[in-house]
Amino acid sequence: MTTIERITTPRIRIFDTTLRDGEQSPGCSMSPPQKLVMARALDELGVDIIETGFPASSQSDREAMALIGRELRRPSLSLAVLSRCLQADIETSARALEAAANPRLHVFLSTSPLHREHKLRMTREQVLESVRKHVSLARSYIDDVEFSAEDATRTELDYLIEVARVAIAAGATTINLPDTVGFTTPEEIRAMFQQVIAGVADVPNAANVIFSAHCHNDLGLAVANSLAAIEGGARQVECTVNGIGERAGNCSLEEIAMVLKVRQAFYEQDSSINTPRIVGTSQLLQRLVGMPVQRNKAIVGANAFAHESGIHQHGMLRHRGTYEIMRPEDVGWEDSQMVLGRHSGRAAVEARLRALGFWLDEDELKLVFEQFKGLCEQQRVVTDADLQTLMQGGSNAQGYRLASMTISDVGSRANALVELSDPDGNRVAETAQGDGPVDALFGALSAATGVQLMLDSYHVHSVGIGADARGEANLSVRHEGVEYDGTGTSKDIIEASALAWLDVANRLLRQRQATAHNSTDVPTPATA
């Protein structure tokens, strides 16, 4: 039997629904073995409840529940499955939960006027009777039963209170009030939780019931609404890793966990999340479902702890608290990133050069900084290899340059011929075939340069207006396990793609040159 803690406990339960609601995001389906891998990571992350799927909907979800239930036996971990308010669904779900050490049966029914009339075609009284009947049935199988009033935030408040009273009287141990379509606002959901909790206070055992928030992100308010629900009395938040889910997604687990950690003094609540595992869990999910997060995603995005502004970098060098409210290592990143680009100042460039072993006097630094600024006009980001090349006097800094290219069709495939000028000024020509013009182009560039790149993502868009518009190609690639980004701009999008590819290849070339140079001539730091 699962012990239900009182709502006064100063801890927010994290109900992870990545494997159920998150998986409903287009393109994010997972096989049972993949779900098991993800469930292991969620267990290590420290979530309180893992919703593994919807057993009545597929054999795959039943298999996943069996795999996960047999392996994950942590006493403080509950495993949940979702069920409609239908006898057959509940019986199927109860059987699926037999493998779980601490099972939870999660039943739901729509309660809003829109859903009652157009989806269920049921009256208010019929919905109440269905809740009473099916929560009681679920409780006859499982001691821990959660009831969700689907579309709660668009349900009449007096009726929502009545539904919650019936569900609690029938044996529900958790009442979930979902913002199913991401419609509500923080002020509204805070008041809703306060009034529903007050409205059920006299129902027997209501003091032991946990109220839960499940917020969608259609208006970008899922995390804000979940926090407001906590202020209103919710003690469970339903969320997903990386915020994946239907439409615009769900409340982001990593964001809610870090808000509670960073602002613990304000919310006077915490969670059981092992936060240094957040980034690893996020990256595992990205690999499993093939859905990367945007670079500026809070907590887990590549830019979450990256600083390019010169003012910010200068402050960070003096005290990291000037521009960071949490430490990157607290969520699983190794360290903050000082991204050197056109917004960077001399202090950041000098600090990076010293980290690379180059100690310069004021005149030397002034000269190198001018060269650095010139390089920033040619590329978005300046890497360690670029700095090392500057310190070597810029030898071969130009790298490979595109001289010409020809794309043609060969039956159902494309053929690319590229001619490059190598770093020494020699001409190199290579051809390759591919499934399309870009695939063939990248193959020919690889043959010409000897650089092998694994493409992760690629997109093009227009820059400028009218006749002055140019195509910009952006790609992310991997080389020997390291991720690189490249950018190219041209009137022709295929040429822009070639320039983006060469942007990365030339960076790797400079890196090799710098490594070779340093292996024979390592600069000695000045003594203090």
Curated annotation (Swiss-Prot):
The keyword Transmembrane helix does not apply. PROSITE patterns: AIPM_HOMOCIT_SYNTH_1, AIPM_HOMOCIT_SYNTH_2, PYR_CT. GO terms for biological process: L-leucine biosynthetic process. CDD domains: DRE_TIM_IPMS (cd07940). InterPro entries: 2-IPM_HCS-like, 2-isopropylmalate_synth_dimer, AIPM/Hcit_synth_CS, Aldolase_TIM, LeuA/HCS_post-cat, LeuA_allosteric_dom_sf, LeuA_bact_synth, PYR_CT. Its main location: cytoplasm. SUPFAM superfamilies: 2-isopropylmalate synthase LeuA, allosteric (dimerisation) domain (SSF110921), Aldolase (SSF51569). GO terms for molecular function: 2-isopropylmalate synthase activity; acetyl-CoA C-acetyltransferase activity; manganese ion binding. It comes from the Bacteria. Belongs to the alpha-IPM synthase/homocitrate synthase family. LeuA type 1 subfamily. NCBIfam families: leuA_bact, PRK00915.1-3. Catalyzes the condensation of the acetyl group of acetyl-CoA with 3-methyl-2-oxobutanoate (2-ketoisovalerate) to form 3-carboxy-3-hydroxy-4-methylpentanoate (2-isopropylmalate). This is 2-isopropylmalate synthase. The gene is leuA.
